[in-house]
Amino acid sequence: FRGIDVSSLTKNVAEEVLSDPNSNLRALLSWNEPQQHAKALPLSRFSVFLPPRSNVHGDPWWLVEAKGLRNSDGHVEANVYEPPACSTPAEALLGELFGMFHRNVFLVTRASPAGTAAVVARSRNGTLDILFRSHIEFQISAPPDRPLWFTPAQFQGRVVISNDGSALHHFEAHVPTDRQLNVDLEWLAQQHNSDVQRTEVDIGKVAEMALRLDSPSGQSPETYSSSISYNEEDKALRKLHQMFFPFLKIPYHNLSATVAEAKRHEKLVHSIITWGPLDDQSC
């Protein structure tokens, strides 16, 4: 884990902290190391990644489902600092894993997309290659400072586990860094000479935020790094994306490919122009 690159932000964080001793952006500047660098967990706990018995192979399922988001508009609550208690084994495991970065990890974000979904990308020789995607966030301030929410664009993960849960060959989860920005920030700020609090926002980039398994059972992680084909991975990731963004079930095409597709299907062109990517907002 490496803290956020302050040069990627639109605000001058250092200047704001110097000008306001009570600024809760101090928490952002001081968060340069994970809460825990390493953690030992029983193998049996990773069986939560196994698909439900009723699952149809290739269909995604929820590990943590967002049932009624706290704030549909994602606004910052003045008195929320710590996450609710975990209620399922999957929540407990993910809470411990992502809690290695910061203890105040919320497994369901304040606004969609939210939660964690998984899908079996490949099943072979009694081993499941599972991809998962998590939308979580961290509240990194502590009283009396006001809340500051750190929301990664997503965590993308992979688990290679025997279908009976007896062997874990590979585990990793990371915030993708292929885009220019990958973290949203929201915090409460006090207006000068007033008791009124306002929400401020920014967006930036964290260069590295990842979890990895150090000593897998059986084969080494390198053995499994290429065990899934590009087509299998692409198909599985597309299904995960559709869990969080149902509109992606409709095929979208770049402008350069639209004319050819329209001719092939003998259909008219419906044009949609957006300011940024649809699937991960501005991230």
Question: Which residues does each PLM region occupy?
Answer:
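Conserved thiamine diphosphate
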Residues: 245
